[in-house]
């Protein structure tokens, strides 16, 4: 019995990263900002649960799943001028097709190489990394740009503290001309 307990804890050390203690107050505040801002609503894919769609927390904040290839969106009318995917991570409308990006700190597919200033500028300006293409609907950057710089820094610190998830989100598709 003693061997099993020791073996369990030894394996647990390899299965999970070392516990670094309580998160800093900034990371705790960042988690509050991310949760209150509803970032999981679009950046965490939905999966079908026993009571209907629910967030797939194994993919928390990883954006549109790279393995989910969508058909062309249905025709839109004035009455129905935008549609969303079943994962709630892809959206089509007059702006084209937009995909929720990977907000995890994965260096290749997420925001792992972003600097704090890139993140703040993106939210304040509505441009990818603060200088790139426009951030597309339904991302409510127009509302988030009113967050304080300290709240945006906290949100970025929190996002950089979560586990990285490798997930290459498809590129934005402009509207057909």
Model-derived regions: residue spans:
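Acidic helix-start/capping segments at beta-turn-to-alpha-helix junctions
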Residues: 44-67, 173-176
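The canonical Cys-X-X-Cys-His
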Residues: 30, 36-46, 119, 155, ...
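Surface-exposed patches in mature extracellular/periplasmic domains of secreted proteins
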Residues: 41-44, 131-136, 166-173
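C-terminal capping alpha-helices of c-type cytochrome domains
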Residues: 113-129, 141-170
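Bacterial N-terminal signal peptides
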Residues: 6-15
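Positively charged n-region of N-terminal signal peptides that target proteins for export
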Residues: 1-5
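Electrostatic cytochrome c docking/interface patches
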Residues: 18-35, 47-53, 69-72, 109
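Electron-transfer interface patches adjacent to heme c in soluble/periplasmic c-type cytochromes
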Residues: 59-118, 142-152
């Amino acid at each position: 019995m003693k061997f099993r307990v020791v073996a369990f804890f030894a394996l647990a050390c390899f299965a999970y990263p070392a516990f670094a203690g309580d998160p800093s107050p900034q990371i705790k505040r960042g988690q509050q900002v991310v949760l209150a801002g509803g970032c999981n609503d679009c950046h965490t894919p939905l999966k079908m649960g026993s009571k209907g769609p629910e967030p797939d927390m194994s993919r928390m904040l990883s954006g549109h799943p790279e393995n989910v290839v969508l058909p062309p969106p249905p025709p839109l009318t004035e009455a129905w001028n935008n549609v969303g995917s079943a994962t709630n991570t892809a959206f089509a409308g007059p702006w084209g097709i937009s995909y929720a990006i990977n907000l995890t700190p994965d260096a290749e597919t997420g925001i792992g190489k972003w600097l704090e200033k890139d993140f703040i500028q993106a939210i304040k300006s509505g441009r990818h990394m603060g200088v790139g293409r426009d951030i597309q609907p339904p991302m409510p950057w127009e509302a988030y740009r009113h967050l304080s710089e300290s709240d945006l820094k906290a949100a970025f610190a929190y996002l950089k503290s979560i586990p990285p998830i490798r997930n290459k989100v498809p590129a934005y598709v402009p509207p057909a001309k």
